[in-house]
Design a protein with these regions (language model features):
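Beta-strand-rich recognition domains
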Residues: 1-16, 53-269
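Accessory beta-strand-rich segments of carbohydrate-active enzymes
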Residues: 3-61
Length: 269
């Protein structure tokens, strides 16, 4: 692979969230004003939908009742830039050194009124063909008490096994995701699986897999990809499978974006 398709999001004095094909991939704010993420596993053949939300709701905002929009006035300084870039492997992902395939900009002049959250979108094509990912064929699912209980059980089992230095259940649960990520980045699935296994075992050996408590109150399911995926989040809006900080303040987070088919959960992203 000579080039890497990435999403680059920058913001000044505001919060912003970027999505691709309905899946939120990057969020920035004053503390973290820039973010770059590879996006092969979320790109599709044909038209792709790029989304940018200014002042997004918290990730765990309840779907109902809907919160009212907030009236705001631009100060001429706040801005956000979203780019899809195609840099060469090893090169810096900057507009000056990479091909720009799509972009969204928000920079209202001083005094302009707007309502937040403010959503912008753009459709664009890609010069690369991607497979038809499984999540595109997943059924639309709803966050129900039964599904929430099932997700809680799965996450608790994964956390227990990983904390004991036993990654087999996690590797099996994420097999479909691992296979597609390997395909997306032209790697071998078995190599990707082994890399993940070694990483998890190394973290356990370092004593870094003490997970935050996984409780019903700490699990939230965020709908995305037009309802085809549910992301398992904790009370802070990050992945529910997140460790307690170690002595250096480092945490490990393992995102889980799942679907449900015939009563069984599958981790697809």
């Amino acid at each position: 692979m000579e080039r890497l398709l990435v999403l680059k999001l920058d913001a000044v004095d505001c919060e912003a969230e970027a999505s691709l094909n309905g899946v939120p991939l990057a969020r920035v704010d004053a503390a973290r004003p820039s973010c770059i993420v590879p996006i092969h596993e979320y790109a599709i053949a044909g038209p792709n939908e790029l989304g940018l939300v200014i002042w997004p709701r918290p990730a765990i905002t309840p779907a109902s009742p809907p919160l009212p929009a907030e009236a705001r006035v631009a100060d001429g300084k706040r801005m956000a830039q979203l780019r899809i870039l195609l840099p060469r492997i090893g090169s810096v992902a900057e507009e000056s050194t990479a091909r720009t395939l799509a972009q969204l900009d928000w920079a209202p002049p001083d005094g302009d009124s707007y309502e937040a959250p403010l959503a912008l979108s753009q459709s664009f094509g890609l010069p690369v063909n991607f497979p038809r990912w499984r999540w595109l064929e997943a059924p639309v699912i709803e966050d129900t008490p039964t599904l929430r209980a099932q997700a809680l059980k799965v996450v608790k089992e994964l956390a227990t096994d990983l904390a004991a230095g036993q990654p087999a259940r996690f590797l099996a649960a994420t097999r479909l995701r691992t296979e597609e990520i390997a395909l997306a980045y032209q790697r071998r699935p078995e190599d990707e699986t082994e890399r993940l296994r070694e990483r998890l075992l190394a973290l356990h050996a370092e004593g870094r897999l003490t997970w935050r408590p996984v409780t019903p109150e700490a699990l939230f399911l965020r709908s995305m990809a037009e309802g085809r995926l549910l992301e398992c989040l904790g009370a802070d809006g990050g992945p529910v499978l997140t460790t307690e900080p170690d002595g250096q303040g480092r945490s490990v987070a393992l995102p889980l974006r799942v679907t449900a088919v015939e009563g069984r959960l599958y981790v697809l992203r």
